[in-house]
Amino acid sequence: MINNLKTFILLASLTALLVVIGGLLGGSTGMLVALLFAGIMNFSAYWYSDTLVLKMYNAEPLSNNHFVYHIVSELAHRAGTSVPKVYLINNSTPNAFATGRNPENASIAVTTGLLDRLTQEEITGVLAHELAHVIHRDTLINVVSATIAGAISGIANMFMWLSMFGHNSNNEEGVHPVVGMIMMIVAPLAAGLIQMAISRSREFEADAGGARISGNPQWLASALLKLDQANHEQYFDEAETHPATAHLFIINPLNGEKLANLFSTHPSTAERVARLRAMY
């Protein structure tokens, strides 16, 4: 219920932001166009954002005979929830995420690198963590916030170009360069804050929930240490291309030295591991 309310607030905020920008660009006509655009975007964010994210990462569905599907199925039955669809991302960087608007329409995606680097027990710990996100209904707000963060970044880029090429000396049309500069600075910060505020506390709850589902918190603790090390050693190219989706993953896939990772979307791995080890 709380996450549904958060989703409504995020969609309403996106609508308000677009309407304000539409007013700045085109007056009352711009506001109407922006309102229509926001309605389409909100509809798409709710119904299709999960499909879009899976396509971003070229995720392919796994068959019901794959051992990962069997693990997910067993965990779901143990937790008393619907069995999510399972997808595989062909990338050597080990990571995973869950998406979907509700438990009945959820999906879990893992990379080939995760299957190559982790033991079956560690894989079970990761899958239980992602299933906990599904049960807690984090997946809808996570994927909607990714859409909003991406939209904010796109709007910032639009203002940058308009401020550079759309302004004339009489200020009769176009966007004033100062407005463009403000949007260029504020919008990415707002996007980062949205992601950080939503995901950090939810990761702790999913860690604890996943540990209870799997029955062994040490499996996830061990997996997190391996995933953290691997993600510092190599780039996840698709994630670098789509930084607004970083908070979906169990471990932040972005390069820590980049400005795109100025705001941490995840708690520290050390703190997460310490909490898991203290559970039992």
Swiss-Prot record:
Main location class: membrane
Record's keyword annotation contains Oxidoreductase: no
One GO MF term: zinc ion binding
Gene3D superfamilies in alphabetical order: Metalloproteases ('zincins'), catalytic domain (3.30.2010.10)
Subcellular compartments: Cell inner membrane
Lineage: superkingdom: Bacteria
Positions that bind Zn(2+): 129, 133, 203
Membrane topology reported for the UniProt record: Multi-pass membrane protein
Gene Ontology cellular-component terms listed: plasma membrane
TM region(s), chain numbering: 7-26, 30-49, 146-166, 178-198
E.C. no: 3.4.24.-
Catalytic residues identified in the record: 130
CC cofactor: Zn(2+)
Keywords, alphabetical: Cell inner membrane, Cell membrane, Hydrolase, Membrane, Metal-binding, Metalloprotease, Protease, Stress response, Transmembrane, Transmembrane helix, Zinc
Pfam families in UniProt: Peptidase_M48
The record's free-text note on cofactor binding: Binds 1 zinc ion per subunit.
Gene Ontology biological process: proteolysis
PANTHER family in alphabetical order: PROTEASE HTPX
Protein family per UniProt: Belongs to the peptidase M48B family.
Protein name: Protease HtpX
Naturally occurring in which organism (per UniProt): Legionella pneumophila (strain Corby)
